[in-house]
Each structure stands twice: as structure tokens, then as C-alpha cells.
Amino acid sequence: MDTKTLIASEIAKVVPELEQDAIFNLLETPKNSDMGDLAFPAFSLAKVLRKAPQMIASELAEQIDESQFEKVVAVGPYINFFLDKAKISSQVLEQVITAGSDYAQQDEGQGRNVAIDMSSPNIAKPFSIGHLRSTVIGDSLAHIFAKMGYKPVKINHLGDWGKQFGMLIVAYKKWGDETAVQAHPIDELLKLYVRINAEAETDPTVDEEAREWFRKLEDGDKEATELWQWFRDESLLEFNRLYDQLHVTFDSYNGEAFYNDKMDEVLDLLEAKNLLVESKGAQVVNLEKYGIEHPALIKKSDGATLYITRDLAAALYRKRTYDFAKSVYVVGNEQAAHFKQLKAVLKEMGYDWSDDMTHVAFGLVTKGGAKLSTRKGNVILLEPTVAEAINRAASQIEAKNPNLADKEAVAHAVGVGAIKFYDLKTDRMNGYDFDLEAMVSFEGETGPYVQYAHARIQSILRKADFTPSATTTYSLADAESWEIIKLIQDFPRIIKRTSDNFEPSIMAKFAINLAQSFNKYYAHTRILDDNSERDNRLALCYATATVLKEALRLLGVDAPNEM
């Protein structure tokens, strides 16, 4: 139990008028540590108990069980709690040393599934930094949900259907080179796509031909289907090479095409429930009672189904297949209206499990303040960016530690980790400006800074030849150690907050705080001096490294032991 929860529970025993959660939220940290570690203001009880806050504080301080604390004193209208730092540090260190990387593992999920729709790039289009956010936020949330006891199901809902495939088939049949496509699938397919679109601007027959090929594809034509499948397979090979570099895996690659034969059921269900209304020849579902002004357009006047129809089919399939406790869509904020409609239509269909669906939105990545766009050529491709980040990391590692073994693997961990961490430390609803130099810096609030703190601790532990014993009691009570102990003790709550808010930046900021607190401790404390505190300090180092490494893992970032 963390200290705030302990204090709230002890106060609740003598103040039945307030819920423990309300007490927890009222607790304050005094500005001056001489006034205690935490304080409870008695003002909130004045009306209920009809007494002055000073009198309430004085009476309650007498009633609270002091055995868990160093002391409990009333100071004016506050009850001030002085924690038994030696006792708490001993408990926290024992928990981390005993559990190792399982420290702070929780069982909220009880093994239930969480479906995570993430990454989802378009086939035959380059994988840019714009796709990175959905990929790394989704991957981090998968780690967090697993730590909370859920079973994450990571779904890459590929953009593998649409009229652009008609254009691609026309282009490939005109100018395609099988060997070139196999060597560089995305580059070659993109060149073909750009070239055919340029030709279509002056030749109207191109569009007609593309429409005809897409119609053939929809009808299951053998040649069209084989070409589409080949474009998809070759693109996916290239995407998977990138995912391997990012250390991101998926449980399903069911993309848009997978739901082609599942949309008729959606239309039948909507029809059976009398939810479809005709509007200008199209079929819509009115959602005004959900505060949504624009109806959901289900089927166009020409009979074509729309994106939302496909997403309805996907939602039904995922519920039946995974029986999810939560279904999470990690998609840019520009799709907010779409996901509000999606949830509302499912609710209207009588599916209360739509309440378990969450759009985890995020802001844009810009470059020099400008929005990135594949169409305008203002795009940052991920593959060369990752390579550049690794090179920059390698240069810094070479300068700091030229004799480091396994330099390539460490440079990869630092370069890739730098890009991921920079993205994840940003509150997801905020965008950020892409700055590779800032990302790969070993100074400031960066991934390499946190990784370096972890590597520094591992170096200390190697020099000391120290491994903690689960049967030894370690304890510290000095102010610098206490700052670190408080953070380590707070780790389970940080994981829960990150999970509840679908917000990996909470975890990233925690990792930065812990690294900063340790570096401050390292600067002021002679850890390796041979005195009575040596093993206690080394146990603290061990616990800090364990939690730092786990915090980074939950962000999808590796923690090298040497840098």
C-alpha cells in the first residue's frame, strides 16, 4: 500500500463522514518538509462536524493510530503526518528486490482481452513519421494493459482496399517491373501511383480504366485479385522490416479488405432494427439523440458502402472473436467525429458493449511548424529517419565509450528508443515538432537521458559486485534516498493512471523524474564508500535500475546495461 492510501485509510477509520477516495484527494504535500510528509486539511469537515477546523485537527490527531508513522501532529487546521522513512524504505526495497521486473504487476484485467487498433498504414504508401504515433502509442498501451492484467490483442487494420488499387493495377500493367517492385515495393508502387495520377489529369480514360479494374477486383476477377494480393504481400514485407526495427509485433493484420464479405450483415441488422433512413437517395442513421448533428452515412445513393459500415463490421467481428473488455482505437484526432458516430450507431443497434470502446486520439507531428503531407512531398519517411537516429546515437556512444562491446546493438536501442520516447513523452492530444537532434540528445528530457541513468546504475552495481539478497533488510532514511523511494513506491499508481487515461506520457514523465532523482542522488552521495550505508545505497541503486528498466519497457524502449 502506498503512503497516501495508508494515510487516507487511517483517517477514514476515525472520520466515517468522508469516503477514503475523497480523503485521498484532499491530502497535500507541505511546502516545508519540516511540517511533515503529507497533511490533511480539516476545513472540509467543519460544516459536517460543526466545529472549528483547528479543533477537528487536534481531536483527530489524537485518535489516529500512530503506530504506522513516525508521528502525527495537529498544526492549526491541518493534521500533519511524518512518515517512518526507514520502515517504508525497507518495505519498498524488499518488494522490488523480491518481485524484480514483476514489481507493480496488477490483476485488474483478470486475463480479459483488450483489442487495440493501431498503426494501420496504407498499402503501397510510404510509412512516415505520421504513422509512428499510432504505432508507438498503441504498442506502449499494450504493454501497460498487460501490466494491469489484461491480454492485449494488437490489430493492424491495414488500409488494403479502395479505388486506388484500380489505379495501381492500370499503372503496373502499363509500366510495372516485377523485379523492381520486389526489390523496393513501396518506392516502386508509389512511383507508379504518382505517375498514373499525373496521367489521369490529362487523360480521362485512365479513371474509367481504373474504375473498371477496381470493379473487377470487387467481383473477384482472378488477375485483379492476384495483383492486389501481390501488392499487399510485398508492402507488408517492407512494413514488417520496419516493425522489426521498432520491436513492434501484431496479433492480427486483418485490414479493410477482410471485412468485404461482412458488411451485408451490418446492413441487414440496421434494416431489421428499422434504423436506416433514406436521405437524398442515400441510407443514413440519425444520431441527434446522442448530440450528433450529422447522420451516419451508411450507404451512398449508388449503392456503395462507406468507411463507417466497414468499421461497424469490424467492431462486431472483434467483439465476437475476442469478447473484449475494452476496444481501443489509436487514431488521429481528425477522426474524432467518425468514432463518435461509430459508437452511437452501435449503441442504437442495442450493443451496450460500445461503451467499452475508446478512441485514443492524438495530435499531429509537424516539421518546422508545417503539417506533413505525402501528397505535397512534405513527409518524413520512417526508415531513413531511424537509420539517421541510430547513426547519431552511435557517434555519441563512440565519443563517450569507444571501447564499448556490442556498439551496434546499443546504438540501435538508443536511436530507436530516442524516437519512441520523444513521441510518448508528449501528451498525446498535443502534437510535436519533429526534431531529431533534440530526440537523440543525452541531455534533457529524452530517452537517451533515461537509458544513460539506467546504464550508470548498472555500472555502479558491476563495480561493487553487488546483488541484493531477498533475506537481508535494507533501509534508508536520508532526504535524497527518500525522494527516490517515494517515486518507486508510486510506480503501481503511475501504471494504473497511465492505463485509465490511455496516456503513455504519464509513464514517460515518471521515467524522467526517476532518472533525474537518481542523478541528483548520485551527485551528492558517495555510494561506493565502504561504510555501514553502502549495501543499503546499493540496494536502492538496484531497485531504481529495476523500475527504470521496467518503465522503459512499458514504453517499448530497451534499456542497455552499458552505453
Curated annotation (Swiss-Prot):
Biological process annotations from GO: arginyl-tRNA aminoacylation
Record's subcellular location: Cytoplasm
Keyword annotations from UniProtKB, A to Z: Aminoacyl-tRNA synthetase, ATP-binding, Cytoplasm, Ligase, Nucleotide-binding, Protein biosynthesis
Molecular function per GO: arginine-tRNA ligase activity; ATP binding
Listed EC numbers: 6.1.1.19
Reactions listed under catalytic activity: tRNA(Arg) + L-arginine + ATP = L-arginyl-tRNA(Arg) + AMP + diphosphate
GO cellular component: cytoplasm
SMART domains reported in the protein's UniProt record: Arg_tRNA_synt_N (SM01016), DALR_1 (SM00836)
Cysteine pairs bridged by disulfides in the record: none
Keyword Protein biosynthesis: yes
Subunit structure of this chain's protein: Monomer.
Family the UniProt entry places it in: Belongs to the class-I aminoacyl-tRNA synthetase family.
UniProt name for this protein: Arginine--tRNA ligase
